[in-house]
């Protein structure tokens, strides 16, 4: 029996309270908001089938045909034409369609019927009272791994999670693969042909450094990025410091390659979350001050090289450099362990629109560098090249998604008015003023260019 799903916001959703003593499977989901207006509602989805069986679903990623799936759910009578809550996310719509399909067959067959029609980036875990299922989209944009315990199995979005619970890594779940895990063991079914396009930003920022992706250590990748960054963007300075945590390995690599000493110039408050994934600018800016504090005795009077993982909006770096100068840094040279982020992500990262991406404002490369340098207040600014970052990952370029850096989206996006990024939020806004699902085709849906 399955006991419960624990959502990232701390919500517990019981599946069958009477079965707690016999619980054999459970799921934990911690997922950051993918839309700027996201609310701290439960991120796990729980649905009942017509037969009364509970279905719980967790989703990492973002769909690009949400409008199409929402219309299908509406046509099946699963969502009212006004689309009231709780259908507030692409995950909720998937859960509704799965539960509906399982009413006429099995949950496994419902998944095999539904998954080929779902487009976008998705790693799904879902379960009924007897079986845990896990799958990845055919492009494998997000990682998903299978682990083994003495008396059970574990599925996790990072291998570090397997280590934490004492599970041994078995293998990555393949793109286009559906796993079913029950009392008889694990069985695998292919629901689509694989076309691997793993997100390179997992190596740069999203993944924990103690995880491995496609057999490559995230920490080793970040250190190697730092070494290559030092070769591509050298500068004379007294000390290399990293912006913790994801910028630290690259800073170590930069120091190793350049011969400039590495030092810990910033202290991180371990009780503050990652600022990039906060849903609003106000919370992000407050988080920067709460999260980082300069070690004045280390940086006072020094020419600093500050290595960070990425620049998205530029707010973190602007506030950070102001803090470093106030603490006595003579010069601040910024080096970035990824290329300029110029394009929004529709596959599970909150890069919502080009207007919010600081590197997108100017197309000429040199002018862009100068504009960003001036905006964040750095003495010099350097990014690693796309080629250098890919080489550090030791993955073939053909197997990576680099859309946020070069605009080449591996999963075809639908017409601009049907993009799934904020379509559910827009639909609910329409519902509040008396419109419905049919208005998804209107020109009022937010357009991302």
Indicate residue ranges for each PLM-predicted region:
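Flexible loop/turn segments at secondary-structure boundaries
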Residues: 65, 133, 141-142, 162-163, ...
């Amino acid at each position: 029996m399955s006991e419960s799903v624990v959502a990232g916001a701390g919500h517990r959703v019981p599946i069958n309270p009477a079965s707690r003593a016999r619980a054999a499977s459970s799921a934990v989901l911690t997922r950051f908001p993918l839309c700027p207006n996201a609310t701290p509602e439960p991120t796990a989805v729980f649905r009942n089938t017509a037969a009364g069986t509970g279905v719980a679903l967790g989703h990492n990623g973002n769909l690009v045909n949400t409008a199409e799936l929402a219309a299908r759910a509406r046509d099946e009578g699963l969502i009212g034409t006004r689309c009231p809550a709780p259908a507030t996310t692409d995950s909720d719509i998937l859960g509704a369609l799965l539960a509906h399909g399982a009413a006429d067959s099995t949950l496994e067959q419902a998944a095999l019927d539904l998954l080929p029609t779902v487009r976008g980036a998705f790693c799904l875990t879902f379960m009924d009272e007897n079986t845990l299922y896990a799958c990845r989209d055919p492009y494998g944009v997000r990682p998903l791994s299978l682990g083994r315990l003495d008396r059970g199995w574990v599925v996790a979005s990072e291998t570090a999670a397997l280590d934490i619970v004492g599970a041994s890594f078995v293998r990555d779940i393949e793109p286009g693969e559906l796993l079913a895990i029950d009392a008889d063991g694990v069985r695998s079914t292919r629901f689509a042909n694989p076309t691997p396009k793993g997100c390179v930003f997992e190596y740069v920022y999203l993944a924990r450094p103690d995880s491995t992706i496609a057999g490559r250590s995230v920490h080793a990748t970040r250190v190697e990025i730092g070494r290559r960054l030092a070769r591509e963007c050298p500068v004379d300075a007294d000390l290399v410091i990293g912006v913790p945590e994801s910028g630290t390995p690259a800073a170590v690599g930069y120091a190793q390659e350049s011969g400039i000493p590495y030092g810990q110039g910033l202290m991180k408050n371990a009780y503050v979350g990652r600022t990039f994934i906060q849903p609003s600018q106000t919370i992000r800016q407050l988080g920067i001050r709460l999260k980082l504090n300069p070690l004045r005795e280390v940086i006072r009077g020094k020419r600093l090289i500050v290595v960070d993982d990425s620049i998205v909006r530029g707010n973190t770096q602007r506030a950070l450099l102001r803090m470093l100068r106030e603490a006595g840094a003579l010069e601040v040279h910024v080096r970035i362990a990824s290329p300029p982020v110029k394009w929004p992500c529709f596959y599970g990262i909150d890069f919502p629109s080009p207007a919010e991406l600081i590197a997108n404002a100017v197309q000429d490369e040199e002018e862009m560098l100068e504009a960003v340098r001036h905006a964040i207040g750095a003495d010099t600014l350097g990014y690693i090249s796309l080629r250098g970052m890919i080489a550090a990952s030791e993955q073939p370029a053909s197997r990576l998604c680099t859309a946020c850096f070069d605009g080449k989206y591996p999963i075809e996006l639908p017409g601009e008015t049907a993009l799934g990024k904020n379509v559910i939020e827009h639909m609910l806004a329409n519902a509040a003023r008396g419109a419905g699902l049919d208005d998804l085709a209107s020109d009022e849906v937010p357009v991302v260019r």
